[in-house]
Regions:
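Leucine-rich solenoid repeat scaffolds
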Residues: 136-168
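Intrinsically disordered, low-complexity regulatory segments in ankyrin-centric signaling systems
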Residues: 1-23, 34-49, 53, 57, ...
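Ankyrin repeat domain, specifically the short helix-to-loop turn at the C-terminus of the second helix
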Residues: 19-28, 53-62, 89-98, 126-134, ...
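Ankyrin repeat A-helix N-terminal signature
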Residues: 7-12, 42-48, 78-84, 115-121, ...
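Ankyrin-repeat boundary/"N-cap" motif
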Residues: 1-5, 30-40, 65-76, 101-113, ...
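Alpha-helix initiation and capping sites
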Residues: 13, 26, 33, 48, ...
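Conserved ankyrin/ankyrin-like repeat signature
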Residues: 16, 50-51, 86-87, 123-124, ...
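Eukaryotic tandem repeat interaction scaffolds
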Residues: 70-73, 77-91, 97-102
Length: 169
């Protein structure tokens, strides 16, 4: 379900977005079941670069906000899940944590690097390595990025990770 902010986001209508965000309240943009999503998630969902950039300039505390949905997806992980290199780069350029935010209370721990490997997206793996992603993280099942690459048979990604691990030492 799209709320007025979500409709403006989908339509890339920055003037309406600015007007809707002018008040003290932060209206939600989209809802699904019992969950609601703000403009940042919605901009990624609709692949709206200008809206995402505007929202990132408006919310400078991006890493202090807890952005993690019920599946442990942070903004960056969500962009990776959608294989959106362009928006992932924008998030990283604006300083979002390269490893995402992992709350100790989340049932699932989903890291951007793991999502890139699971999708066999070499370009996204390279982007995370460029921003020095932690290659020693473990997901909810205790799997590391290298183990996942081996498990999925992603040989090129496995080689990239091994090179990245050497550089991080």
């Amino acid at each position: 379900q799209l709320y007025p902010l979500g409709i403006a986001c989908r339509n890339n209508d920055l003037e309406t977005i600015k007007r809707l965000l002018a008040g003290k309240d932060e209206p939600m943009a989209m809802g699904h079941d019992c969950y609601e999503f703000d403009i940042l998630y919605t901009a990624i969902y609709f692949n709206k670069e200008d809206v995402l950039k505007y929202a990132l300039t408006r919310y400078k505390d991006i890493n202090d906000r807890v952005y993690s949905d019920e599946y442990g997806l942070t903004l960056l992980t969500y962009a990776y899940k959608l294989s959106n290199v362009k928006l992932a780069r924008i998030l990283l350029e604006y300083g979002i944590h390269v490893n995402g935010y992992q709350s100790p209370y989340d049932t699932y721990k989903v890291y951007p690097i793991m999502e890139a490997i699971a999708n066999n997206n070499i370009e996204l793996v390279r982007l995370l390595l460029e921003y020095h992603a932690d290659l020693n993280v473990k997901d909810s099942n205790g799997i590391t990025p290298l183990a996942l690459a081996k498990e999925t048979g992603a040989k090129e990604i496995e080689n990239l990770l091994l090179q990245g691990m050497k550089q991080q030492k």
